[in-house]
Amino acid sequence: SGSSPSSNSNYCNVMMFCRKMTQGKCKPVNTFAHEFLADVQAVCSQKKVTCKNGQTNCYQSNSAMSITDCRQTGSSKYPNCAYKTTQAQKHIIVACEGNPYVPV
């Protein structure tokens, strides 16, 4: 299956473009979670942690999830955004807000 992130080093380049994260500038980092939406939303009721920016509305998943980490390569410049694709199984941290409380 050539479409899975693990076998496709171009995954991030395609997905970042499709999700409009390369319009106007290159978004430097993005993580895609390959889990059911309900499982990602459930993280908002799991372990509360402090966000990187100091906010207190972040939560860490109880279990490892399948993710793809996309990071802009050092040599890429807008409009030719290029990304390194890394697949991993790890606990994710999401910021949550609203009612119902959902990832943002």
UniProtKB/Swiss-Prot annotation:
**One example GO MF annotation:** lyase activity
Q: Nucleotidyltransferase: is it a keyword of this entry? A: no
Statement: the UniProt record of this protein carries the keyword Transcription: no
Q: How does it assemble?
A: Homodimer; disulfide-linked.
Disulfide bond entries: C12-C70, C26-C81, C44-C96, C51-C58
Lineage, highest ranks first: Eukaryota, Metazoa, Chordata, Craniata, Vertebrata
Mention any Pfam family matching this sequence. RnaseA
| Name of the featured protein | Seminal ribonuclease
**Classification via Gene3D superfamilies:** Ribonuclease A-like domain
EC assignment: the record states 4.6.1.18
The GO cellular component terms are: extracellular region
Q: Which InterPro entries match?
A: RNaseA, RNaseA-like_dom_sf, RNaseA_AS, RNaseA_domain
Q: Would you say which domain of life the source belongs to?
A: Eukaryota
Q: What is the annotated localization of this protein?
A: Secreted
Keyword set, alphabetical order: Disulfide bond, Endonuclease, Hydrolase, Lyase, Nuclease, Secreted
Q: Which family does it belong to?
A: Belongs to the pancreatic ribonuclease family.
Catalytic activity annotation:
an [RNA] containing cytidine + H2O = an [RNA]-3'-cytidine-3'-phosphate + a 5'-hydroxy-ribonucleotide-3'-[RNA]; an [RNA] containing uridine + H2O = an [RNA]-3'-uridine-3'-phosphate + a 5'-hydroxy-ribonucleotide-3'-[RNA]
- What GO biological process, any one, is recorded here? defense response to Gram-positive bacterium
Record-listed substrate binding positions: K27, P28, V29, N30, T31, K52, R71
Major place of residence: secreted
Organism equals Saiga tatarica (Saiga antelope)
